[in-house]
């Protein structure tokens, strides 16, 4: 099995790191290309994979080709690679918002896997949602499951529309959480906590709370209620958030992303 990455940014590196560290594939079985030669040189040196300057050369002997470019660049890539894929090759797309049907038309190719990981893939904590076309090789389906497992948890869905929904929740989700963390740190500073202490308290509180949620059998609502004493400080804070339609605005944000 040989695979190629067209686009060698952070998500490509996360996948390459997971694949090589888990020994899912050998470094010599992995090719990469990018318009920025510095990126492929970096990946070549760090992971001992093969670097190419030409996309056609990179995909020539690959079984699976990962498209890891920005969605707005897909039309340019299709001009170069349309009709260049063989029947025994599978395109793997990580492009947000780009439908399988669109990819089939752009590349005139039917064997396609669409995946949507998220940035915690960089630390092997991704949640990846994926699906595939009916004409995808069963061997490639099995391989992508192993690859996604190497960077975290994977969830197969039959309906492609669920990937777009998941993109709004789990793929964009880290950004929402980081904004919340930023806000908590800023609030801590605002009430007088030293900068470093506010940052440490916030990040460790988030870490502990997520671990509690994962290990507890209680629902998020029940865990929240456990912290909230009637007439206490937590209730005072939550009242402000509720009056500001905190939950409704989160739902509104997810719908905007979808």
What annotation goes with each model-predicted range?
Residues 1-53, 57-61, 126, 189-190:
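NAD(P)+-binding Rossmann beta1-loop-alpha1 motif at the extreme N-terminus of oxidoreductases
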Residues 30, 40, 58, 74, ...:
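Small-residue helix-packing motif on alpha-helices
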Residues 37, 46-47, 55-60, 64-67, ...:
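Rossmann-like NAD(P)(H) cofactor-binding subdomain of soluble oxidoreductases
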Residues 106-111, 127-165, 178-214, 256:
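Internal alpha-helical scaffold of NAD(P)-dependent oxidoreductase catalytic cores
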């Amino acid at each position: 099995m040989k695979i190629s990455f067209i686009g060698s940014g952070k998500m490509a590196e996360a996948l390459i790191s997971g694949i090589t560290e888990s020994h899912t594939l050998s470094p010599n079985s992995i090719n990469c290309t990018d318009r920025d030669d510095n990126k492929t040189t970096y990946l070549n040196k760090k992971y001992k994979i093969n670097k190419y300057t030409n996309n056609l050369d990179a995909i020539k002997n690959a079984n699976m080709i990962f498209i890891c470019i920005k969605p707005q660049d897909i039309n340019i890539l299709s001009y170069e690679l349309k009709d260049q894929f063989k029947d025994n090759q599978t395109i793997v797309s990580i492009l947000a918002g780009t439908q399988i049907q669109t990819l089939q038309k752009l590349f005139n190719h039917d064997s396609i896997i669409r995946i949507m990981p998220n940035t915690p893939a960089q630390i092997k904590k991704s949640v990846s949602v994926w699906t595939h076309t009916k004409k995808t090789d069963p061997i490639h389906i099995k391989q992508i499951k192993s690859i996604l497992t190497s960077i975290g948890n994977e969830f197969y869905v039959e309906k492609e529309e669920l990937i777009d929904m998941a993109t709004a929740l789990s793929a964009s989700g880290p950004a929402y959480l980081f904004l919340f963390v930023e806000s908590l740190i800023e609030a801590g500073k605002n009430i007088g906590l030293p900068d470093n202490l506010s940052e440490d308290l916030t990040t460790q509180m988030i870490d502990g709370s997520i671990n509690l949620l994962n290990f507890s059998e209680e629902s998020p609502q029940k865990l929240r209620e456990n912290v909230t004493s009637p007439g206490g400080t937590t209730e005072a804070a939550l009242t402000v958030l509720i009056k500001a339609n905190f939950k409704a605005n989160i739902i509104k944000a997810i719908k905007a992303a979808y």
